[in-house]
């Protein structure tokens, strides 16, 4: 066995070979893709729409710009960005999972969003775009599933234009202890049951909960973005820190 194959990472609370995580995460999202939007509404009581709306407002995206919606899944952010950039702008919806990408493409086309959106199956760690290419990159509820987060952040930095910005919307660490206890009880006991009823897959939503707990907290992620080269990194807690929006610039 090579040294590289012995390198491990987390898959929820499990420790797995780095080479295996991508395949394991892919199975999760293949399983949940068809009910992904419904489950988001049920799990968050619809609040995910508020979090995403705030992200759009914080992005500063304008007409004629080029935006990368990374781990864009079913295209919620892409749909909004498409309107903001206009017919001469461009939005690239990228996702490593072909099932999610297919759902996003079908959903946006059903809504008549076709002219300025393209679709790319891509690994966040090795983005297939030129240097200094995008005005803005967003990654929404996707970074925690990436095997090598530091490498992915460096890849995002590379493809951003000078003056461009990265926004990372992700589950984080609640800042109030009572909220944290309620959140834990809901996440570990109720979410998997919802997943079992709606998707017939409790394990995928158990992984979701565990992956959130293993994700870097607010200050740690801020430091990782700075190490990747981003300047003026800041974050905003939402819903008591259950979710945080990190923002950084490339100068």
Swiss-Prot record:
Which domain of life does the UniProt lineage start with? Bacteria
The answer to whether the entry has keyword Signal is: no
Q: Where do transmembrane segments lie in this chain?
A: none
Q: Which SUPFAM superfamilies match?
A: S-adenosyl-L-methionine-dependent methyltransferases
Name this polypeptide is given = Ubiquinone/menaquinone biosynthesis C-methyltransferase UbiE
Pfam families linked to this entry:
Ubie_methyltran (PF01209)
- Which residues are involved in binding S-adenosyl-L-methionine? 74, 95, 123-124, 140
Q: Which family does it belong to?
A: Belongs to the class I-like SAM-binding methyltransferase superfamily. MenG/UbiE family.
- What EC number is given for this enzyme? 2.1.1.163, 2.1.1.201
Q: What is the lineage of its organism?
A: Bacteria, Pseudomonadati, Pseudomonadota, Gammaproteobacteria, Enterobacterales
